[in-house]
């Protein structure tokens, strides 16, 4: 099976100087992959020449005349830059010429343009950003990580359904456990939105563990953690900052004297394993779930190594049939979502699904 991916080469802080080398490295190590490199043709070809990859058969350059800047407002990306590398890359997915799109571009713009071009799956009001965070036994899938700053209870229920389908597809788990991120495990904790979301989750057919706290994220307490995009993005950035700080402290302490430098040499195998386990770059690449096409969002600041991992996320999603499984799961569970709302309503709250959905493009930050 050939996996066809589009790469938004102009997105992110570094553009083709990062995205093209990452694509070249990935193509050379994955003979069953075909990559469409979308962007300013001269800039892409200059990088390919530099890497001596002009004739690599797995790579095809697709011209696009415009770039969505990291600080461009959503309306500019959506209405004015119709020939941007982001838009052209997404159009190739819509037209069936590629199976997934990978971009390090402006988060708000990518979400808005993706939703406009690809549309959402049946039963989904808002797409969400999902990514894997490490735990001692593997990883925990967490969503939303920045697409929706403000959420209604039914959105958190839909995120849980999507997280369930994603982990089931990637890990083969029939009933992955779901946790709702809160300030305490007790049912009475949290704001009204969280309490109502908890009622919906308890009334659903999902394997709902209950409320989880921030320290559960890296324990592996549950398979999927659900939260709104504001909380999720703060948690993600905090964890990355902590990992970087720990690495810097260890490097600084081992470099203090000749003795500590000798100790560092002796401890090098352990240090390298530690560095690999806390290196956030290998977890780069978050899926925009809920769309009628696969979209992977890379960090805007990612280097070539990190962006290559984002490409791998898209590749793995295609190989595992994530989109098809997600669409099937949402279609099958659409009725159960409504039933959960009715059950929760009977428990004392009006059904939030009957309410007016909030503004869909809550996330307007320039970088994820």
Swiss-Prot record:
GO MF annotations in UniProt: phosphate:acyl-[acyl carrier protein] acyltransferase activity
Protein known as:
Phosphate acyltransferase
Physiological role: Catalyzes the reversible formation of acyl-phosphate (acyl-PO(4)) from acyl-[acyl-carrier-protein] (acyl-ACP). This enzyme utilizes acyl-ACP as fatty acyl donor, but not acyl-CoA.
User: Which reactions appear under catalytic activity for this entry?
Assistant: a fatty acyl-[ACP] + phosphate = an acyl phosphate + holo-[ACP]
Keyword Mitochondrion (UniProt) = no
By sequence similarity, the record places it as follows: Belongs to the PlsX family.
Per the record, the gene is plsX
Q: Where is this region: Disordered?
A: 334-368
Q: Does the keyword Transferase apply?
A: yes
């Amino acid at each position: 099976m050939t996996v066809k991916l589009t790469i938004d080469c102009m997105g992110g802080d570094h553009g083709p100087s990062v995205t093209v080398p990452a694509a070249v490295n990935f193509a050379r190590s994955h003979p069953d992959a075909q990559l469409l490199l979308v962007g300013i043709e001269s800039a892409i070809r200059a990088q390919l020449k530099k890497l001596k990859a002009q004739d690599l058969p797995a790579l095809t350059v697709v011209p696009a005349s415009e770039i969505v800047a990291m600080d461009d407002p959503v309306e500019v990306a959506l209405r004015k830059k119709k020939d941007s590398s982001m838009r052209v890359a997404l159009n190739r997915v819509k037209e069936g010429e590629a199976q997934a799109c990978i971009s390090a571009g402006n988060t708000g713009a990518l979400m808005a343009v993706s939703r406009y071009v690809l549309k959402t799956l049946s039963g989904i009001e808002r797409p969400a950003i999902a990514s894997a965070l490490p735990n001692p036994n593997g990883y925990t899938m967490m969503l939303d990580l920045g697409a929706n700053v403000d959420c209604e209870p039914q959105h958190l229920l839909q995120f849980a359904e999507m997280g369930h389908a994603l982990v089931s597809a990637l890990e083969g788990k029939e009933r992955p456990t779901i946790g709702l991120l809160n300030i305490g495990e007790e049912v009475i904790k949290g704001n009204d939105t969280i309490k109502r979301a908890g009622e919906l989750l308890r009334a659903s057919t999902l394997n709902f563990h209950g409320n989880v706290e921030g320290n559960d994220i890296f324990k592996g307490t549950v398979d999927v953690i659900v939260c709104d995009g504001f909380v999720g993005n703060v948690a993600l950035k905090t964890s990355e900052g902590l990992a970087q700080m720990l690495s810097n402290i260890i490097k600084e302490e081992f470099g203090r004297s000749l003795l500590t430098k000798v100790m560092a040499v002796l401890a090098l195998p352990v240090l390298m394993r530690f560095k690999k386990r806390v290196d956030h770059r290998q977890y780069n690449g978050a899926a925009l779930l809920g769309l009628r096409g696969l979209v992977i969002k890379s960090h805007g600041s990612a280097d070539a190594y990190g962006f290559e991992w984002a490409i791998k996320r898209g590749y793995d999603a295609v190989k595992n049939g994530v989109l098809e499984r997600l669409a099937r799961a949402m279609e099958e569970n659409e009725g159960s979502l409504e039933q959960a709302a009715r059950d929760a309503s009977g428990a004392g709250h009006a059904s939030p699904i009957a309410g007016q959905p909030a503004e869909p493009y809550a996330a307007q930050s320039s970088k994820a």
